[in-house]
């Protein structure tokens, strides 16, 4: 079978020498070709997340993990469906909304209480519309 580690590594397509690292897959699978990398320090993996994406993830988490189960369900379903569609200014408005006490948010989105002027935003209207239109997918009779 295999007599050395080098034979094992070469059989699985990964060869390591002192100066060169080659990662490759067979041309038969996915059309990949041999890739030579002389200096690994030149490789930069771009896995940074933009500030707007960080805000989206934060708001999605905060929408699903509230103090009231009702808000978890209503805001969580809204955020899951719509957070990627919101503009940066809408995200800022939504962030401000989520900083308010849960009972207030609940009453505002269900229109059970008057909404203060600073929270009368397009985002609140989107949330209200979402909550009015069967957000959890239950069928009404």
UniProtKB/Swiss-Prot annotation:
Gene Ontology biological process terms, A to Z: mitochondrial electron transport, succinate to ubiquinone; mitochondrial respiratory chain complex II assembly; protein-FAD linkage; tricarboxylic acid cycle
Subcellular location(s) of the protein: Mitochondrion matrix
Main location: mitochondrion
SUPFAM superfamilies with a match to the protein in the record: YgfY-like
Keywords: Chaperone, Mitochondrion
Single GO cellular component term: mitochondrial matrix
Further information: This protein may be expected to contain an N-terminal transit peptide but none has been predicted.
Annotated function: Plays an essential role in the assembly of succinate dehydrogenase (SDH), an enzyme complex (also referred to as respiratory complex II) that is a component of both the tricarboxylic acid (TCA) cycle and the mitochondrial electron transport chain, and which couples the oxidation of succinate to fumarate with the reduction of ubiquinone (coenzyme Q) to ubiquinol. Required for flavinylation (covalent attachment of FAD) of the flavoprotein subunit of the SDH catalytic dimer.
Family, as annotated: Belongs to the SDHAF2 family.
Subunit: Interacts with the flavoprotein subunit within the SDH catalytic dimer.
UniProt protein name: Succinate dehydrogenase assembly factor 2, mitochondrial
Species whose genome carries this gene: Dictyostelium discoideum
């Amino acid at each position: 079978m295999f007599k050395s580690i080098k034979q094992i590594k070469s059989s699985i397509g990964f060869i390591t020498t002192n100066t060169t690292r080659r990662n490759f897959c067979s041309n038969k699978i996915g059309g990949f070709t041999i890739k030579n990398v002389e200096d690994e320090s030149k490789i930069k993996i771009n896995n940074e997340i933009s500030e707007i994406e960080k805000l989206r993830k934060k708001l999605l988490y905060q929408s699903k993990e509230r103090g009231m189960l009702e808000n978890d369900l209503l805001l969580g379903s809204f955020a899951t469906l719509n957070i990627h569609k919101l503009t940066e200014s809408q995200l800022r408005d939504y962030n401000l909304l989520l900083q308010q006490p849960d009972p207030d948010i609940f009453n505002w989105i269900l229109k059970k209480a008057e909404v203060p002027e600073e929270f009368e935003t397009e985002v609140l209207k989107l949330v209200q519309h979402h909550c009015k239109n069967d957000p959890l997918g239950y069928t009404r009779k």
